[in-house]
Amino acid sequence: SLKKAYELLFKKLAEEGVFRRKRPIPDCIHRIGVISSRHGVVIHDFTKNLARLGYRIRFVDTRVEGEGAVEGIIRGVRELNQEKHGLDVLVLIRGGGSLESMQAFNNEAVVRTIFGSRLPVIAGIGHDVDVPLACMAADASASTPTATAVLINRSWAELTETLPRLEQRMLHHCATLLRGQRHMLQVQSHHLVNS
């Protein structure tokens, strides 16, 4: 059965440590490689929920279930891992579905390709009960494509909240430095006049 095969593969990959490594997702991501199907609402929801921050997106269109899905996902990860694209992170997204429809994301070759990615991988694969093995092998995972967009936006949102405070601290520091320099000039000027 699919459930038994899922459990056996999970055990095997867990023993190998495939699910342990979690690389940090870069702050303020700018260039995103996306692997998904161009058809359906998933890619639309994902891009709609990315903040308007000028992300550069390189997209690989592939089937995400059925015939050709495994090969397409592997091809997408390998293609987008090439340094010539200059990407910060890979995103693998699809909507939810049954255990049967998620088989490409429970495929050993797909899981190992994700684990072997040069770039950090975020998996945004909708699921209810059985978390796809691809999500476990990814460096970060969100339960939906929309939640994946929120995860990517988070560091930019934190930065935009922090910038005004940093600006105030910098202005205060500059004012303090200027007061100190002004005082030193006054002391030196007074010293020169009295010499």
Predicted segment positions?
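Charged, elongated alpha-helical interaction scaffolds
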Residues: 128-195
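Phosphate-interaction motifs
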Residues: 1
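Residue-level detector of flexible, active-site-proximal loop/helix-junction positions
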Residues: 64-66, 121, 128-129, 140
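Short, acidic/small-residue loops that bind anionic groups at enzyme active sites
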Residues: 58, 109-128, 132-133, 145-151
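Phosphate-binding glycine-rich loops and their immediate beta-loop-alpha structural context
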Residues: 4-101, 106-117
